[in-house]
Amino acid sequence: MENTQKTVTVPTGPLGYVYACRVEDLDLEEISFLAARSTDSDLALLPLMRNLTVEKTFTSSLAVVSGARTTGLAGAGITLKLTTSHFYPSVFVFHGGKHVLPSSAAPNLTRACNAARERFGFSRCQGPPVDGAVETTGAEICTRLGLEPENTILYLVVTALFKEAVFMCNVFLHYGGLDIVHINHGDVIRIPLFPVQLFMPDVNRLVPDPFNTHHRSIGEGFVYPTPFYNTGLCHLIHDCVIAPMAVALRVRNVTAVARGAAHLAFDENHEGAVLPPDITYTYFQSSSSGTTTARGARRNDVNSTSKPSPSGGFERRLASIMAADTALHAEVIFNTGIYEETPTDIKEWPMFIGMEGTLPRLNALGSYTARVAGVIGAMVFSPNSALYLTEVEDSGMTEAKDGGPGPSFNRFYQFAGPHLAANPQTDRDGHVLSSQSTGSSNTEFSVDYLALICGFGAPLLARLLFYLERCDAGAFTGGHGDALKYVTGTFDSEIPCSLCEKHTRPVCAHTTVHRLRQRMPRFGQATRQPIGVFGTMNSQYSDCDPLGNYAPYLILRKPGDQTEAAKATMQDTYRATLERLFIDLEQERLLDRGAPCSSEGLSSVIVDHPTFRRILDTLRARIEQTTTQFMKVLVETRDYKIREGLSEATHSMALTFDPYSGAFCPITNFLVKRTHLAVVQDLALSQCHCVFYGQQVEGRNFRNQFQPVLRRRFVDLFNGGFISTRSITVTLSEGPVSAPNPTLGQDAPAGRTFDGDLARVSVEVIRDIRVKNRVVFSGNCTNLSEAARARLVGLASAYQRQEKRVDMLHGALGFLLKQFHGLLFPRGMPPNSKSPNPQWFWTLLQRNQMPADKLTHEEITTIAAVKRFTEEYAALNFINLPPTCIGELAQFYMANLILKYCDHSQYLINTLTSIITGARRPRDPSSVLHWIRKDVTSAADIETQAKALLEKTENLPELWTTAFTSTHLVRAAMNQRPMVVLGISISKYHGAAGNNRVFQAGNWSGLNGGKNVCPLFTFDRTRRFIITCPRGGFICPVTGPSSGNRETTLSDQVRGIIVSGGAMVQLAIYATVVRAVGARAQHMAFDDWLSLTDDEFLARDLEELHDQIIQTLETPWTVEGALEAVKILDEKTTAGDGETPTNLAFNFDSCEPSHDTTSNVLNISGSTVPGLKRPPEDDELFDLSGIPIKHGNITMEMI
């Protein structure tokens, strides 16, 4: 736990409110863009946002009135019990939801959810959750408030800790305490909710029969209220909150989860098990029973390092339920947290600033939801996503050092098991129960799986389809079935579909799944995989530069030195030095720190050959000067061990647990919750074997006895390197507590004479999870097992730096050569071509096929300068990424110079890439089928309406689809405080010798699924990817400037063409794409070409080529016509290749610059680097004569 304790003052209040709004006072169009609602239900979820669903002055964290305690002689008085909590990030519309537009036009989603629920054996919400319930309808509430039921929307805003208590009818409406607040255009009435325990002093538990007015715990003289039960609200909470949690916890009795969570909300001292003992489990053959694993080795083989579990799966089932119980306790810890972040104010969103009228705001909102669809889709398309972790596996007992079985952190793990959910169920002893469900070997993705991961909630499923409808069909990953042809071709066929009719088939959920079927995950045998998580960056601080946290502040500061200011020490860090370099480059007009990924500003600086060469000289000089000074300060002033620091450097970032940062809509909040549950259970499962070891686990009382032990072991993991928490001391606002008077009932005004006592004065607040990635691959094989050593040897080959000739366009200056080719080499174009072509020009140059008389003196001088710069950079380069802008070149160049100072050799370093989501208008008729709102009467009518939609996209704010771009300036992307998706694997280990504390590390890993997840993913072990959807500048302000099998995809073919080079690479790429994609190529634009090539300039060339071919064709565009046009263009450009040149070819290999621009990089080790001059024999690292005090501490080993 952190040593620093913070004090926070919070107000007191009810556990929730029912808001009553007139329809005309709400911005329903904007609300509908953020809501979750299906077409067949009036129930809906909305995000908790100020000036949208709650008032601007809404207080999100408070001390909730959760009960009463007797005080005084003979218990004559009462004191209110107060429990800290924050409001749940989603609100529940249970009346008037029909006024909110459905998230998706897909019909009968409730039917789909019910069918999937029955297939997988989860319980339904049938009737009231308690006996004797009396319903309070929405119409009754409206009538009591004097509002028209048909023109009123009612929704519940509830604290996170007590939402299950609302479902269990343990609350009542306090009509006497209603007040009026202002939201958007009008006044809104809100009714507070309080727990019925307020009328039952000293009852610190869930009341199983709240409608029993003769309950013996009711205080004498108290006027007991009518508990609040509403059928629609209970169904909404059950399906959209509790059932998704039950799926994640593998508990099919959903009401048992609700009962356990509600009990923990009232009883803060409960530590035992809360889930019932009769929980059922999915039957499947565990790999630890001696069967073949996914890796092909038998668990009971004599050469295996693990043994089969002797309990026949009993310990696996026990670990599953105990981890689920621990996760429920962890949810209570989170729900009682006090967070400073407040719900976002929609009126303060930067993307709405300066917009007039409704349509521009809706267009901006529609565009941003398409961006969000990129990260939502990644969680759906990745098979190792936290959404699919529905089962627990036992990898078998590991061998301890003495040869016997010992406790292991890695024995139990979660794995993706939706394909097993329909298997029969077993009890705790493994006996198969009678069940209608049967297992199936068909692992094809279906709508049932989507319903499963959504907890069978139709509103959540509709919202998930809302985002999937904005994802493309994966046209670049092979198997390019056309959804339009599928719908039109089957329109008159009798296809059995339980969800749609002919006229609604284009918008059916099955059609959406069919369109995306190539991207949907496939599940197989249980294997340990990284966890695909969804989270939010709530801080602009991250160590995502090429060398991560090299030379950090905590290491550079001198312990006990009170004379130096912290800011002075901070200026000597690697992070601050790189920032100063960017400032220097900005002053030279080479970089715009507000848009560091763009090189457009260089157009005003580079106007001819001399300015281009001057830019190279300035860039090199600035970087080398900054790096030399930085290393000098580290060694001379800071006494920093530069080589040891490099081996310890890590990339790092933190994903916040703050409940409102990821609450853009109900689905993003849902994904945050699923991520939390997956991470918590991963940690809890790691401690299960340690709890089981040496115990008689088969005992009936074992779980109740050792559940508190597992919970304490889990809590001990906090602040151990992965989950960060902070202790907060809570104080109450001055004044008495306002609450209903128990002697007057629920209609009387609130009494203001109560005192309140906090259940816990000190609260542990979960802040964030830390993700790290080691910068340098060490290749050290000592103290490792044989299996680990073999894996490390395989990794070493991937990290081995290869010495090869550098292609100029793929080197350090490739992006500049492409951007300014037309300016520098206007005649550098193929014969019979009208536009300069850098691929053709540099290919001929490097093949020594360019006639010398076609080059001017200025061009030759520039070519020599480019060649020298590129070769010098390549000689010291250990980063397996070509720069794509000045910012990337500067940070890579500086990182390589630091590596050179540290004598780094042999291995490439780990690098980071941020895939940034974007938005574009759809161009393919297949991608707009789900937006067809008119009934279709024929197959031809479908295509006609789809094309009509494409013609008026500007007036339809919902017509946006997602797009992707990439950048290696990851810190700049993290400054946007984005929503992110990435893979993490959590390692657990003991501390130093004699330290029994368990530490963890959230290792940055990958998302399985390859290009199905994102078209810009590439298989490279040295790279780490993160998909980001920026929030800064859109919905929050910004301050300051795969799996192991690599698939053969169209993107891989295109990248292969680019790597192989060629004079007319554009024509080869275009022909390949047309052959693979077919008629879809007609609608391809710049974003599509960029997704394929990951090269902005080549993508623009391909876009121009595409437009040229369309203009050339005399008939409408066809595949055959396009390929014929490509063939004609190729013949024209190669017509002169067979001619004998009249003069000698320009010799590129012997090209050298006419002037010497000696690099001032110093080689600390004295070793030579190809392309750099050997330093003089008497050259020293730094002149140390002026520092006599430090001279004795610097050794030759350090130098």
Swiss-Prot record:
Pfam families, alphabetized: Viral_DNA_bp
Keywords: DNA replication, DNA-binding, Host nucleus, Metal-binding, Zinc, Zinc-finger
Region (Disordered) residue spans: 289-314
Gene3D superfamilies: 1.10.150.560, Viral ssDNA binding protein, head domain
Subcellular location: Host nucleus
Main location: host cell
A biological-process GO annotation: DNA replication
Entry annotated with the keyword Metal-binding: yes
Chain intervals for the UniProt region annotation (Required for nuclear localization): 1172-1199
Keyword Zinc-finger listed: yes
Gene Ontology CC terms: nuclear viral factory
Stretches annotated zinc finger (unnamed): 497-510
Annotated motif Required for filament formation, positions: 841-842, 1146-1148
InterPro entries: DBP_sf, Viral_ssDBP_head, Viral_ssDNA-bd
GO molecular function, one term: single-stranded DNA binding
Subunit structure: Homooligomers. Forms double-helical filaments necessary for the formation of replication compartments within the host nucleus. Interacts with the origin-binding protein. Interacts with the helicase primase complex; this interaction stimulates primer synthesis activity of the helicase-primase complex. Interacts with the DNA polymerase. Interacts with the alkaline exonuclease; this interaction increases its nuclease processivity.
Family: Belongs to the herpesviridae major DNA-binding protein family.
Role of this protein: Plays several crucial roles in viral infection. Participates in the opening of the viral DNA origin to initiate replication by interacting with the origin-binding protein. May disrupt loops, hairpins and other secondary structures present on ssDNA to reduce and eliminate pausing of viral DNA polymerase at specific sites during elongation. Promotes viral DNA recombination by performing strand-transfer, characterized by the ability to transfer a DNA strand from a linear duplex to a complementary single-stranded DNA circle. Can also catalyze the renaturation of complementary single strands.
Protein name: Major DNA-binding protein
Organism expressing this protein natively: Varicella-zoster virus (strain Oka vaccine) (HHV-3)
